[in-house]
Amino acid sequence: MTKNNDVLMAKKIRESLEIIEESYEFLLTYGAQGRKHETDDKGPSKIRESLRLFENALEKIQDIDLSVYANNISDFNKRFLDDLKVVRSILKSLLELPVITSDMIDNTNGLIVIRSVMTSLFFIDQVFLPKR
């Protein structure tokens, strides 16, 4: 891969990371709201939009190859991409439900695989990607 492609891939990852981070922050807030329904007296929630954005952003980086940034990273890269696929399936499953409650999202937020992907993304950004 050329240096220009490396920079483009880093930009793609960082753009996705920004969307993922915003979506995850919304999930944390929603999980703490105690909603039994997506719509309440304040109007409809944006939970489905947030889940879609999260899943779409993960899809955009589902084929990244970190070996362009570091040697001996293949095991980490494989594990990260496997976890990413699991998180995508969780988000898709939630979107298929007729109602998404705060408790469902709170439990989703607590899943180790969700935290693993989030932490791995921050690690990738700080350690492997070219400096901003």
Tell where the protein language model's regions lie, with residue ranges:
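Amphipathic alpha-helical binding modules
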Residues: 87-132
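Short, well-structured alpha-helical interface segments that form or flank functional binding sites
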Residues: 8-11, 15-22, 49, 56, ...
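Short, well-ordered alpha-helical segments
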Residues: 79-89
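Short, charged, amphipathic alpha-helical segments
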Residues: 39-45, 78, 104-112
